[in-house]
Amino acid sequence: MARKHFENHEAISSAVPVDDGFEAVIAVKRRDTDDTARVFKVANGRHYDLASEAEVAAEAALTKVREVSNDGELIWEENAI
């Protein structure tokens, strides 16, 4: 799990269990509210057999996030997706 701080948001990479393994995700939460975090699937929704594999993919994706918009959308580096 990795954490990245932005101007108004915080993002955390993680793996979440799914029926047949794990998915890589990035969760984003606005700092000044109690709103629920938004979860974004990364790695094109690929399923991994091991949680550690999904976490590596999620951490790699998080390094390519430049900023989070005011609406909580991920803003990626150029050519990242």
Residue ranges of each PLM-predicted region?
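Short, intrinsically disordered, low-complexity terminal segments
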Residues: 8, 54-55
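Short arginine-rich
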Residues: 59-72
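Solvent-exposed strand-loop boundary residues in beta-sheet-rich modules
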Residues: 32-34
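Short, charged, intrinsically disordered terminal tails
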Residues: 70-81
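A short, exposed loop/beta-hairpin motif centered on an aromatic-Gly-Thr core
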Residues: 36-53
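Short N-terminal "domain-start" leader segments
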Residues: 2-25
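Helix-coil modules at protein/domain termini and other flexible surface or pore-lining loops
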Residues: 3-4, 45-46, 56, 81
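RNase H-like nuclease fold core
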Residues: 24-27, 36
